Amino acid sequence: MAPSRKFFVGGNWKMNGRKKNLGELITTLNAAKVPADTEVVCAPPTAYIDFARQKLDPKIAVAAQNCYKVTNGAFTGEISPGMIKDCGATWVVLGHSERRHVFGESDELIGQKVAHALSEGLGVIACIGEKLDEREAGITEKVVFEQTKVIADNVKDWSKVVLAYEPVWAIGTGKTATPQQAQEVHEKLRGWLKSNVSDAVAQSTRIIYGGSVTGATCKELASQPDVDGFLVGGASLKPEFVDIINAKQ
């Protein structure tokens, strides 16, 4: 990892937790050592964004797990970047595979959300990744490049974007891409950014890995030159998240 890219660890709590156990988790995180060269962001369920921001130490940022593409309006059940900021969160996760494949969000919609969130001043954790049948068909590169292009077309300022590569077959399955598989895709993504955006953006943009990251797998993954951190699901609700935060130490 280039010295200019600050290690980034995101915890996606998904639709889990209640105030009691999340409060206990937050107490653990607040007591944890967060290295100065590591950025940590937690994404609670929408109902708990305010709660998390009030309880978490300021050294840990808060993200929403999703947002809509406009500021206000008749969009029942949606939240806007402006509302997210109003609750004290500074990041949003967009394009997560569960949004794509469970809720049917298209590349186009995700691109529009990215553009709006950035225009409103939020940082964006933009997720991409292939399904198992796509990997087995040998089209991983094609799929992730197409997804990345739609995101890139909607980004003016890359300093507020973290790209999260999440092979869908490795999310919540206990299967992790090998460090070599992760590095190979991350390296190709950086090459795509260099060819299609700029060398400067390719060098400075953090590309993080998501997909069954645990305290046991994180150190070897973090040692890969193009793996700049993690987006962690299940393990982010457990004390081992602290080990993942310290994967580079």
Curated annotation (Swiss-Prot):
Q: Where is this cross-link: Glycyl lysine isopeptide (Lys-Gly) (interchain with G-Cter in SUMO1)?
A: 142
Set out the biological process GO terms recorded for this chain's protein: canonical glycolysis; gluconeogenesis; glyceraldehyde-3-phosphate biosynthetic process; glycerol catabolic process; methylglyoxal biosynthetic process
Q: Where does substrate bind?
A: 12, 14
Q: Which residues carry this modification: 3'-nitrotyrosine?
A: 68, 209
Which residues are annotated with the PTM Phosphoserine?
80, 106, 159, 198, 212, 223
Q: Which residues carry this modification: N6-methyllysine?
A: 194
The cellular location(s) given in this protein's UniProt record come to: Cytoplasm
Q: Which domain of life is it from?
A: Eukaryota
Query: Which positions carry Phosphothreonine?
Result: 173, 214
Pathway(s) per entry: Carbohydrate degradation; glycolysis; D-glyceraldehyde 3-phosphate from glycerone phosphate: step 1/1; Carbohydrate biosynthesis; gluconeogenesis
NCBIfam families recorded: tim
Q: What is this protein called?
A: Triosephosphate isomerase
Q: Which organism is it from?
A: Oryctolagus cuniculus
